[in-house]
Amino acid sequence: MLPPAIHFYLLPLACILMKSCLAFKNDATEILYSHVVKPVPAHPSSNSTLNQARNGGRHFSNTGLDRNTRVQVGCRELRSTKYISDGQCTSISPLKELVCAGECLPLSVLPNWIGGGYGTKYWSRRSSQEWRCVNDKTRTQRIQLQCQDGSTRTYKITVVTACKCKRYTRQHNESSHNFESMSPAKPVQHHRERKRASKSSKHSMS
């Protein structure tokens, strides 16, 4: 048996030895993991990969296509300033109104239509439906005409205040065109039938 004094001196020595052993194990563990863990190679990540990870891949591109399909169409409004005349009477002040004879184009194309070719290429890919600019809103306006003899006249006229785009199908246009082209021929045929009927009645009477 060792005396108590020796135990008192051996206890700190044992603690020092245990700390050195733990430090040796920690150093070995750190060196071991430094060999196992490999540095991640710096690969340049493309924008398409990031978009697929964050936005669901192809779903993002489909939403872009859906936005392009919902194209709002606008009408180019032409403003007109003119005088109204009736014989020797002319309006005192000029009349300003809208003329709905412009072109119907997508709203995103309208600002860049003059001098830009994007609108022409885009609108050439339209479907079998055509858009026309027609009158949307009108109002009645009174105007005064000044005559050469000093008298004045008051007229009521209809003024266009807004235009809109109306969709027509090509089949509708072709059918109306065929109807208009065939309509003048009908009275001629009817006129010939009348001549033949009159001739036959004359022969029967003779």
UniProtKB/Swiss-Prot annotation:
Region (Disordered): 176-206
Quaternary structure, from the entry: Interacts with BMP2, BMP4, BMP6 and BMP7 with high affinity.
PANTHER family registered for this protein in UniProt: SCLEROSTIN DOMAIN-CONTAINING PROTEIN 1, SCLEROSTIN-RELATED
Similarity field: Belongs to the sclerostin family.
Annotated GO CC locations: extracellular space
Domain named CTCK: residues: 75-170
Compositionally biased spans, kind Basic residues: 188-206
Function description: Directly antagonizes activity of BMP2, BMP4, BMP6 and BMP7 in a dose-dependent manner. Enhances Wnt signaling and inhibits TGF-beta signaling. May be involved in the onset of endometrial receptivity for implantation/sensitization for the decidual cell reaction.
Cellular compartments annotated: Secreted
Cystine connections: 75-133, 89-147, 100-163, 104-165
Molecular function GO terms recorded: BMP binding; BMP receptor activity
Keyword annotations: Disulfide bond, Glycoprotein, Secreted, Signal, Wnt signaling pathway
Protein name: Sclerostin domain-containing protein 1
GO biological process, any: negative regulation of determination of dorsal identity
Keyword Repeat: no
Sites where a glycan is attached: 47, 173
Signal peptide extent: 1-23
